[in-house]
Swiss-Prot record:
Key component of the proton channel; it plays a direct role in the translocation of protons across the membrane. Belongs to the ATPase A chain family. It is found in: Plastid, Chloroplast thylakoid membrane. One of its GO terms (cellular component) is proton-transporting ATP synthase complex. The chain crosses the membrane at residues 30-50, 87-107, 126-146, 191-211, 212-232. It holds the Pfam family ATP-synt_A. PROSITE patterns: ATPASE_A. SUPFAM superfamilies: F1F0 ATP synthase subunit A. It comes from Cyanidium caldarium (Red alga). HAMAP family: ATP_synth_a_bact. This is ATP synthase subunit a, chloroplastic. F-type ATPases have 2 components, CF(1) - the catalytic core - and CF(0) - the membrane proton channel. CF(1) has five subunits: alpha(3), beta(3), gamma(1), delta(1), epsilon(1). CF(0) has four main subunits: a, b, b' and c. Keywords: ATP synthesis, CF(0), Chloroplast, Hydrogen ion transport, Ion transport, Membrane, Plastid, Thylakoid, Transmembrane, Transmembrane helix, Transport.
Length: 239
């Protein structure tokens, strides 16, 4: 029991394997697992679109259900005449986060040794979640400005100029809430699984892992839905 407690206390958080590139420090383990997630998505896309049939069957049929689900995320949050152009972006967010989260929950990355730290889900790193949130932030500003031009900024003084500071603060808190919600949930899930594995090494905590997979899926859905919602708000007409 004492040795288990010592192992739990020795779990490293925030230890990174840095790559030096043009004087910049890059988190190597984050990029490696991100590439794995991207390769998996590309392979699935190739398999699903290879030798396509008019009447979809098997894996092609499954992918069409997935596409309809992803399309509905955008359709339910963005106006009918605008949502189609945002389906690729929202779908990419969801799929990357979903696959990254599941890779972190299912793959025993600790078995792969690297010089420093350990491999984990890309969403286990705050830099990844902040980058995804900033992409969303840039997207809803682009959506609003492309439709309304400089009139977009009138929303900050609507319905009264008194709300200007609050409305500006709201736009800054959106990416913060997106990034920290995703990061916090993924880190907490991985830590819980790690602690259970150390406390009960002979019995893999399957219920905890299943709960983690469910929570990971929900987090991907929440992130994509909120991103679509923010874009929809930017495109909506304010009276």
């Amino acid at each position: 029991m004492i040795s288990n407690n010592l192992e739990i206390c020795s779990i490293d958080i925030g230890v990174h394997w840095y790559w030096n590139f043009l004087g910049l420090k890059i988190h190597g383990q984050v990029l490696l697992v991100s590439w794995v997630a991207i390769i998996i998505l590309l392979l699935l896309a190739i398999l699903g679109t290879f030798n396509m049939q008019k009447e979809p069957r098997g894996f092609q049929n499954f992918l069409e259900y997935v596409f309809e689900f992803l399309q509905d995320i955008s359709k339910n949050q963005i106006e009918e005449k605008y949502y189609k152009s945002w389906v690729p972006f929202i779908s990419t967010l969801f799929l990357f986060i979903f696959v990254s989260n599941w890779l972190g929950a299912l793959v025993p990355w600790k078995l792969i040794k690297i010089p420093e730290g350990e491999l984990a889900a890309p969403t286990n790193d705050i830099n990844t979640t902040v980058a995804l949130a900033m992409l969303t932030s840039v997207s809803y500003f682009y959506a609003g400005l492309s439709k309304k031009g400089l009139r977009y900024f009138l929303k900050y003084i609507s319905p009264t100029p008194i709300l200007l500071p609050i409305n500006i603060l709201e736009d800054f808190t959106k990416p913060l809430s997106l990034s920290f919600r995703l990061f916090g949930n993924i880190v907490a899930d991985e830590l819980v699984v790690a602690v259970f594995n150390l406390l009960f090494p002979l019995f893999l905590p399957l219920p905890v892992m299943v709960l983690g997979l469910f929570a990971s899926s929900i987090q991907a859905l929440i992130f994509a839905t909120l991103s679509a919602s923010y874009i929809g708000e930017s495109l909506a007409d304010h009276h």
